[in-house]
C-alpha cells in the first residue's frame, strides 16, 4: 500500500491455500483469463528502454541496481538460445532457478524463439532426490538447465537415470560454478550419453553468457566450449595483463556488446 505507483496486484492461486477472497486492488488471475474481452494497448518505446533491474551481489558494498535495456536483452538472448543452444519454436525449456537469479531472466528469453518455458516451485531434492530429472522426462523437456552443484549432488548420491525416458532432452546447461570433469563423466554415463552438455558462464552484469556451449565444437570434460558469438572475450590478470597458457584469470569483454547495462537505476 505504501508504493503509490502500484495500481493493481494479480494473485496466482497456489495449491489449496487460496480461498478466493481478495481485498480491494487485488485481482484473481483465473478471473482475468476468463474475461471475454480484455482491453490491450501497445506503445512504442526506444530500443534500450529499461526492461530488467538486477541487483549485484553486494560483495563490494550496497547492492547496485543494474538496469538492462529491452532490445539489448532480446538480441542477446535470442542469439544464445537459437545459435548456441539450438532451441527451436515449440521446444520446451526448463531452467531450475529462483526468480532472484539472473537465470530466471535468461529463461524468459526463450519465449523470443517461440519456445515454451517451464517453472518449478519447490526443492530440487524433494519429495525425491531425482525429482527434476523425472520432471524433464514427464514434460518431455528439450533444454534442461541447472547448477553445477546439483549435478555434483546427483553424482555423490550415485543416482542413475538410464531408465528415464529422456529422448527429447537435447541439451543440459550448467552454471553457477565450474562443472568439473567428473560431473561431465557422470552426466554422459548416468543421465544420457548423447546429450549436449554445455557448461556456461556469464553474470548479472550482462544478464547473459560470456562463454558457453555451441553446436560445432567438441565437448571436453571440465571445459567450456567457447566464447559467445560476437563477443570479444579474453582473460586477464588482476593487474590488467593478458593471461597466457593454462592459468586462472578474470573474464573480460574488450569491445561493446548488446547487453551492456544501460545505467544504474536512479543513479545521479
Outline where the language-model segments fall.
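Adenylate-forming
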Residues: 63-65, 76-80, 105-106, 133, ...
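Conserved beta-loop-beta connector loops within the AMP-binding
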Residues: 232-255, 260-263
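Short beta-strand->loop structural element characteristic of the AMP-binding/adenylate-forming
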Residues: 1, 65-67, 116-124, 153, ...
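Conserved pre-ATP/AMP-binding loop-to-beta segment of ANL
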Residues: 10-11, 23-55, 62, 72-77, ...
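Conserved S/T- and glycine-rich ATP-binding loop of Class I adenylate-forming
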Residues: 50, 56-59, 81, 93, ...
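Conserved AMP-binding/adenylation subdomain of ANL enzymes
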Residues: 74-92, 102-142, 157-158
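Structural core segment of the AMP-binding/adenylate-forming
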Residues: 1-31, 139-140, 147-148
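Gly/Ser/Thr-rich phosphate-binding loop
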Residues: 115, 141-145, 155-219
Amino acid at each position: 500500500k505504501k508504493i503509490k505507483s502500484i495500481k493493481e496486484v494479480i494473485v496466482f492461486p497456489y495449491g489449496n491455500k487460496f480461498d478466493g477472497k481478495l481485498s480491494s486492488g487485488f485481482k484473481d488471475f483465473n478471473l482475468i483469463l476468463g474475461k471475454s474481452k480484455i482491453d490491450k494497448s501497445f506503445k512504442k518505446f526506444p530500443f534500450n528502454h529499461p526492461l530488467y533491474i538486477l541487483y549485484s551481489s553486494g560483495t563490494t558494498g550496497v547492492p547496485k541496481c543494474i538496469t538492462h535495456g529491452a532490445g539489448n536483452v532480446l538480441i542477446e538472448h535470442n542469439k544464445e538460445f537459437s545459435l548456441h543452444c539450438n532451441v527451436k519454436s515449440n521446444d520446451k525449456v526448463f531452467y531450475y532457478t529462483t526468480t532472484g537469479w539472473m537465470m530466471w531472466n535468461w529463461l524468459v528469453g526463450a519465449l523470443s524463439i517461440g519456445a515454451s518455458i517451464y517453472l518449478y516451485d519447490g526443492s530440487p531434492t524433494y519429495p525425491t532426490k531425482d525429482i527434476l530429472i523425472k520432471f524433464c522426462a514427464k514434460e518431455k523437456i528439450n533444454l534442461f538447465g541447472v547448477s553445477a552443484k546439483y549435478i555434483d549432488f546427483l553424482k555423490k548420491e550415485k543416482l542413475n537415470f538410464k531408465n528415464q525416458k529422456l529422448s527429447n532432452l537435447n541439451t543440459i546447461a550448467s552454471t553457477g560454478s565450474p562443472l568439473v570433469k567428473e560431473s561431465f563423466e557422470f552426466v554422459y554415463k548416468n543421465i544420457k550419453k548423447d546429450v549436449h552438455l554445455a557448461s556456461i558462464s556469464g553474470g548479472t552484469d550482462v544478464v547473459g553468457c560470456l562463454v558457453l556451449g555451441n553446436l560445432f565444437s567438441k565437448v571436453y570434460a571440465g571445459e567450456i566450449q567457447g566464447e559467445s558469438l560476437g563477443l570479444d572475450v579474453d582473460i586477464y590478470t588482476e593487474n590488467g595483463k593478458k593471461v597466457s597458457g593454462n592459468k586462472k584469470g578474470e573474464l573480460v569483454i574488450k569491445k561493446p556488446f548488446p547487453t551492456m547495462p544501460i545505467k544504474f537505476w536512479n543513479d545521479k
